[in-house]
Regions:
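Active-site-adjacent beta->alpha loops and helix N-cap segments on the catalytic face
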Residues: 92, 115-125, 165
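Short, low-complexity intrinsically disordered segments enriched in A/P/G/S/L with frequent Arg
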Residues: 13-19
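Residue-level marker for well-ordered alpha-helical positions
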Residues: 70, 93, 121, 141-142
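Residue-level marker for beta-strand->alpha-helix junctions and adjacent short loops that shape enzyme
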Residues: 61, 114-115, 141, 162
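Generic hydrophobic alpha-helical segments
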Residues: 95-99, 123, 169
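Non-catalytic terminal/interface segments that mediate subunit docking, oligomerization
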Residues: 1-8, 19-114
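Peripheral docking tails and interdomain loops at the edges
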Residues: 125-176
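Internal alpha/beta domain cores that form substrate/cofactor-binding pockets in large enzymes
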Residues: 84, 118-119, 127-132
């Protein structure tokens, strides 16, 4: 048996009268910003016959770039930006020729930290010289300042502001 308390339980209903009820927050789905980006991509497809595109500048062997290339593909495609795959580039001249042939304005470097340390600066400079707006998949770490100096404009990584990065990419690519 539960003992009876002599203290009355408080009434959960508001007392008094001078208190104002706050308006409720609007209902918003977390996917809405991504849906808006994909809708803008659909509009571009209907208008010009092609979606916005990013060139994946995959450096090194398949095992070097696969993780970040898949991350970058999913990252950009979540915002309606096509990210066609490729087998990677061991030669910078071949990468630049493939970038030019792709018709993309945006290029994203994809590889391992080891390959980034060896090749990312030169690749970023070459892509920038070829007319690319260069992004890099992954956190830049100690290479951030030299990468930015070499032409990298943005970094796509887990924990970054995905929506603002994709919106900036849409702006670069002329997606309205």
């Amino acid at each position: 048996m539960v003992p009876h308390s002599a203290t009355p339980t408080p009434d959960p209903s508001p007392q008094g009268g001078g208190e104002k009820a706050l308006p409720s927050l609007p209902c918003r789905r977390l996917a809405e910003p991504f849906e808006a980006l994909r809708d803008a991509s659909d509009h571009m497809l209907a208008k010009v016959g092609a979606r916005p595109k990013v060139f994946l500048a995959n450096l090194g062997k398949l095992s070097d770039f696969t993780a970040r290339a898949m991350f970058a593909k999913n990252f950009y495609e979540a915002g309606g930006i096509e990210a066609p795959g490729n087998d990677g580039f061991k030669d910078q001249a071949v990468m630049i020729a493939a970038f030019k042939a792709s018709g993309a304005k945006l290029a994203c470097l994809c590889s391992s930290d080891v390959i980034y340390a060896e090749q990312a600066l030169d690749a970023a400079k070459a892509l920038t010289a070829a007319g690319a707006i260069v992004h890099l998949a992954g956190k830049p770490g100690e290479l951030e300042a030299p990468l930015v100096e070499a032409g990298v404009k943005s970094f796509a990584y887990i924990g970054c502001d995905v929506v603002s990065t994709l919106q900036a990419a849409h702006d670069i690519l002329g997606v309205k």
